[in-house]
Swiss-Prot record:
InterPro entries: DUF2608. Keywords: Cell outer membrane, Membrane, Signal. It is found in: Cell outer membrane. It comes from the Bacteria. One of its GO terms (cellular component) is cell outer membrane. This is Putative outer membrane protein CPn_1073/CP_0776/CPj1073/CpB1118. Residues 1-21 form the signal peptide. Disulfide bonds: none annotated. It is a peripheral membrane protein.
Amino acid sequence: MRRYLFMVLALCLYRAAPLEAVVIKITDAQAVLKFAREKTLVCFNIEDTVVFPKQMVGQSAWLYNRELDLKTTLSEEQAREQAFLEWMGISFLVDYELVSANLRNVLTGLSLKRSWVLGISQRPVHLIKNTLRILRSFNIDFTSCPAICEDGWLSHPTKDTTFDQAMAIEKNILFVGSLKNGQPMDAALEVLLSGISSPPSQIIYVDQDAERLRSIGAFCKKANIYFIGMLYTPAKQRVESYNPKLTAIQWSQIRKNLSDEYYESLLSYVKSKG
């Protein structure tokens, strides 16, 4: 109760200074229901917030650490490509779990409030099917809530932009691709909102990444949109428990069981989408 009183007080102070962004810590995803209303856009970051790989080696942190390791022997571009290929291979193999068991109830509540809801995936567009498959296994369907815009390309791949740099919305999930292309979330939101005739009056963003929430808050301040960043502490604590020594063992065991043909097929898959 005290936590919610603090959140209400923070929001009141925020209303008094409409250009300021608020970031609050939450332990339960149901907290969004306290503030969401019609014309609110509620965003849920998927990777390492909504769902987690059961093995640490499948986390985003492993991808970043693996890239650093590979940079000692490969060029920066080669290291990024190889690390992502290896991480993608793992993402098809590991099991996943839902961080918030009551997320379905939260989505139902947001639907009743007529709030816009958007899942945010940091994966590139050629992993759309894999991401949707993972969410379906938990009966998580973002299309059960009102959509702020239709599915489709936000930035279509052209001769000047690769498939990895493209952004798209599928099943009410925005695929940003930052795990592959480094696209910042504030830039992605700018592209999203530029194509919307009726922008949201407020954005609520649920994530475990405090820095990402701060950058989105700065963008919303410039765009004159109320912003409430919700730092989801159960997911944040899990990210912080990442153990590179443990993942090194997991990666070693996985690599022993994967053939060259497996990674060659993945590489062919990526190139065919490019």
